[in-house]
């Protein structure tokens, strides 16, 4: 195996501050910091996206031991609304520095930073792995554009990767349909930063802010897109025989919000459905702790970080079987799995948890402990180290073979 430490380059379109872009920025941040803590020399090349209106602060200094290099996009609007990242200077930087790394790890598909990196690394003879994290197969938003990108300039990114990381069997299945050979797929789950959950709030501040007292609280936390199934959740909530219950739909609105609001009004739920917007940091943890149950009725969800974080906050969850979330919850316990697109089943599962609140809270706490053992950052990064070493050993063997 390759000796440690390694010089590892991570290329990701969005990083630490880009909560509005979903789970990948947070996962990449957790992963790179954990690798740095384990003694590796970790560099991140990323862009300056943050949200629809603002950019991340530029920095070229270490972040928790990680050397983060941000490259400004030509247009923040194009990056946010079309996921078209145009980082000034990144391509030249990659051409100049690719050969200085032992291995690289690229995050997300259908983006220019990844294509630039794959091209430069291949030219430099440096192996790389790719973590699509659910982005390999175009399933929502600009599907035709993503397919065209994948068939043209993006095609080589997966094709020339030494390994493709699947975070669940569900994602491995997606990759298989795209022609990625099973032998090229490494099954490694997403990491959680367990240190973030050392002190869990009691949820009192979140409830006080909403003015809901001790009323039953159902929470959805995530991006508002059609794929997340929030419409099914609203219908399921309307079927609950709990007129005092409240539904909190928290997350960055990527276009589905107006439809959710209209549905709530049509069901006479507008006074019981609250949309506080994107929650980050401690506010997110307070919301997860305040909830009696977290519902995540998404489809094509290859992992699902939110249900896992709910368990770490001691809150039971309901997820759908059409996703990697179901794999996670079946491994940890602490929640129920229901058929996707079935509001009645979702409603019954939420009611079951609300009726047996103490039992499910105890199960959620136990599941959170299991989650730490299975998905803790050090555990997952140990698996990544083994993957990197295997790739480098194969790469060295290939270079020794006669032409």
Task: Describe the role of every protein-language-model region.
Residues 192, 221, 246-261, 277:
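Glycosyltransferase donor-sugar binding loop
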Residues 259-279:
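Nucleotide-activated donor-binding/catalytic signature segment of Leloir-type glycosyltransferases, i.e.
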Residues 299:
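Aromatic "clamp/platform" in nucleotide-sugar-dependent glycosyltransferases that forms part
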Residues 26, 216-239, 344:
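A conserved mid-protein helix/loop that constitutes part of the nucleotide-sugar donor-binding site
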Residues 127-129, 137-160:
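Nucleotide-sugar donor phosphate/pyrophosphate-binding loop at the beta->alpha transition
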Residues 331, 336-343, 352-357:
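Conserved acidic donor-binding segment of nucleotide-sugar-dependent glycosyltransferases
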Residues 316-320:
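Short hydrophobic beta-strand element within catalytic cores of glycosyltransferases
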């Amino acid at each position: 195996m390759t000796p440690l430490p390694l010089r590892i380059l991570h290329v990701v379109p969005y990083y630490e501050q880009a909560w509005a872009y979903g789970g990948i920025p947070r996962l990449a941040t957790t992963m790179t910091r954990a690798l740095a803590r384990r003694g590796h020399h970790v560099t991140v090349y990323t862009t300056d996206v943050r949200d629809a209106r603002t950019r991340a602060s530029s920095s070229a200094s270490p972040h928790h031991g990680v050397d983060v290099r941000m490259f400004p996009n030509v247009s923040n609007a194009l990056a946010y609304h079309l996921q078209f990242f145009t980082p000034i200077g990144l391509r030249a930087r990659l051409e100049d520095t690719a050969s200085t790394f032992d291995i690289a790890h690229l995050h997300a598909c259908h983006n220019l930073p990844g294509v630039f990196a794959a091209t430069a690394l291949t030219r430099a003879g440096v192996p790389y792995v790719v973590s699509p994290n659910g982005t390999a197969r175009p399933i929502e938003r600009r599907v035709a554009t993503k397919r065209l990108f994948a068939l043209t300039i993006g095609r080589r990114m997966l094709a020339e990767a030494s390994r493709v990381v699947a975070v669940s069997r569900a994602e491995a299945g997606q990759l298989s349909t795209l022609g990625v050979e099973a032998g090229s797929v490494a099954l490694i789950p997403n990491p959680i930063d367990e240190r973030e959950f050392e002190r869990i709030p009691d949820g009192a501040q979140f409830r006080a802010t909403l003015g809901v007292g001790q009323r039953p609280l159902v929470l959805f936390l995530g991006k508002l897109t059609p794929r997340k199934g929030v419409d099914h959740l609203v219908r399921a909530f309307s079927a609950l025989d709990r007129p005092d219950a409240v539904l909190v739909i928290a997350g960055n609105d990527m276009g589905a919000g107006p439809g959710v609001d209209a549905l709530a009004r049509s069901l006479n739920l507008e006074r019981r459905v609250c949309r506080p917007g994107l929650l980050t940091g401690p506010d997110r943890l307070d919301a997860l702790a305040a909830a009696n149950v977290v519902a995540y009725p998404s489809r094509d969800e290859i992992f699902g970080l939110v249900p896992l974080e709910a368990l770490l906050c001691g809150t039971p969850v309901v997820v759908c079987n059409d996703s990697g979330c179901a794999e996670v919850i079946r491994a940890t316990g602490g929640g129920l799995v229901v058929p996707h697109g079935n509001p009645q089943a979702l409603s019954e599962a939420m009611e079951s948890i609300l009726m047996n609140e103490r039992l499910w809270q105890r199960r959620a706490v136990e599941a959170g402990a299991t989650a730490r053992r299975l998905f803790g950052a050090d555990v997952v990064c140990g698996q990544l180290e083994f993957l990197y070493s295997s790739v480098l050993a194969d790469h060295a063997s290939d270079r020794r073979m006669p032409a």
